[in-house]
């Protein structure tokens, strides 16, 4: 399975018609953080779907692209080879407000739960353990990961100076 820039590059290299191009929604992060952005998708059959801005999506809307994205991530994560995971931590771009973070957590919870096997979903004792919560911002999460990876653990009176440049979907955070 290819992810991120490698997947996008392969996808765009292999597009041979505009139907495939316009049926692809590749700006989820930007759409989620824009209050008045309405997105129009055209599927391969030519059907047009107009999405409200992410914060204005309701259960009456056709679908939630973030929930669908979380579902596919869940299918990749939760399988026979990897096992089943019930605890998730999401990191967010620095400029995402509390409302967007809460909505993203809800979308991810619905999508990830849909990716779980029915036997897990129907077992109230197991599904009760399912949790998803907001962690650190993306740059802070990377810094924590890097410190752990390189075995850098400061003493209580010691400081480790570092810089993280996060070149994201339309922003650069430091």
Model-assigned labels for residue ranges:
Residues 25-40, 67-73, 102, 166, ...:
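Phosphate-binding glycine-rich loops and adjacent basic patches that engage nucleotide phosphates
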Residues 13-17, 26, 43, 61-64, ...:
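Acidic-enriched, low-complexity/disordered segments with a strong bias for Aspartate over Glutamate
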Residues 1, 6, 28-33, 147-174:
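Gly/Thr-rich phosphate-binding beta-strand-loop-beta motif of the actin/hexokinase/Hsp70
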Residues 1-46:
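Early-domain small/polar-rich strand-loop-helix modules and first-structured segments
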Residues 46-162:
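Nucleotide/phosphate-binding catalytic cleft detector across ATP-hydrolyzing
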